[in-house]
Amino acid sequence: MKAYKLLTTASIGALMLGMSTAAYSDNWRYAHEEYEGDVQDVFAQAFKGYVEDNSDHTVQVYRFGELGESDDIMEQTQNGILQFVNQSPGFTGSLIPSAQIFFIPYLMPTDMDTVLEFFDESKAINEMFPKLYAEHGLELLKMYPEGEMVVTADEPITSPEDFDNKKIRTMTNPLLAETYKAFGATPTPLPWGEVYGGLQTGIIDGQENPIFWIESGGLYEVSPNLTFTSHGWFTTAMMANQDFYEGLSEEDQQLVQDAADAAYDHTIEHIKGLSEESLEKIKAASDEVTVTRLNDEQIQAFKERAPQVEEKFIEMTGEQGQELLDQFKADLKAVQSESEG
């Protein structure tokens, strides 16, 4: 851990040295929360490629751990050390409480086409969220889904009772903790870098993540029982330091917007079929893995506990959260009506 901290400090020092000669130069810095080849990295590389193909600017991409944990890269973006950051609302929720809306269980549909249409058309996503991020010096460029959340644990989960006395790792997100309390578990916040070891040593009994992240992080090796609960999607957001963005020329602002749009389209194509592909890799790599998909009756037992989480969300966020939730539900209803029609 000490060596990791030293490496992180050295990395940040190198960034600061580069900035001392040309703040906000045409070498833009972009950090995200995942490993090489994971969804956020796919987005970042597509963004980088578009920018470099259509301008003289360059983009340096930093992956998980190179500049610290999620909280670190957000702080560096707000301070102007980084120009761009990709961070899940799971971590942003401590900064922007209303962003925790994605952690209300069973709010989102499970059908991918409906989810993608929602992200494209939602007023809450495309009009309300940018204003919330702007209050914290952040220019929200894109929100996008990465995949359905899957629970892994030391034994199969089929009911809320199976969560009794289970220590489930959560991000540093108050509403996610409330979700697992409602499900009957003991939420246990833990930095991502400590999750594998925590599962291996029994400090925690389980965790949740999209299946591709479970595969790439090797979590199935130490937490082999996978449960598809249908309770939510892992959502993330790509944003810029607002001072940096507003200081760009109109041409460069358009370049950034176009690059984000192109990266979004590329990433959405990438995630189609990714869950199935990742699950097949996991099954091929381990004979100990079990896969449980809850049926409608089992899902209903969890759904019945969701309203108390929604109430907590309103307690945490007040009138602003209520307005966002109302719009969120209206947007979802509109999209679902279109798909049914």
From Swiss-Prot:
Q: Does the keyword Transport apply?
A: yes
Q: Where mainly found?
A: periplasm
> For binding L-ectoine, which residues are annotated in this chain's numbering?
E34, R169, N209, W213, F234
Q: What happens when the gene is disrupted?
A: Deletion abolishes accumulation of ectoine from the medium.
Signal peptide positions are: 1-25
Q: Which UniProt keywords apply?
A: Periplasm, Signal, Transport
Q: In which compartments does the protein localize? A: Periplasm
Q: Which residues form a coiled coil?
A: none
A GO cellular component entry from the record: periplasmic space
Tell whether Transport is among the UniProt keywords: yes
List this protein's GO terms for biological process.
transmembrane transport
Functional note: Part of the tripartite ATP-independent periplasmic (TRAP) transport system TeaABC involved in the uptake of ectoine and hydroxyectoine in response to osmotic upshock. Probably functions as a recovery system for synthesized ectoine that leaks out of the cell. Binds ectoine with high affinity. Affinity for hydroxyectoine is approximately 20-fold lower.
Q: How does it assemble?
A: Monomer. The complex comprises the extracytoplasmic solute receptor protein TeaA, and the two transmembrane proteins TeaB and TeaC.
Q: What protein family is recorded?
A: Belongs to the bacterial solute-binding protein 7 family.
Q: Which PANTHER family match?
A: C4-DICARBOXYLATE-BINDING PROTEIN DCTB, PTHR33376
> What extra comment accompanies this record?
The ectoine/TeaA complex displays a closed conformation. Interaction with the transmembrane proteins induces opening of TeaA, which facilitates substrate release.
Name of this chain's protein: Ectoine-binding periplasmic protein TeaA
Organism from which the protein derives? Halomonas elongata (strain ATCC 33173 / DSM 2581 / NBRC 15536 / NCIMB 2198 / 1H9)
Q: Which gene encodes it?
A: teaA
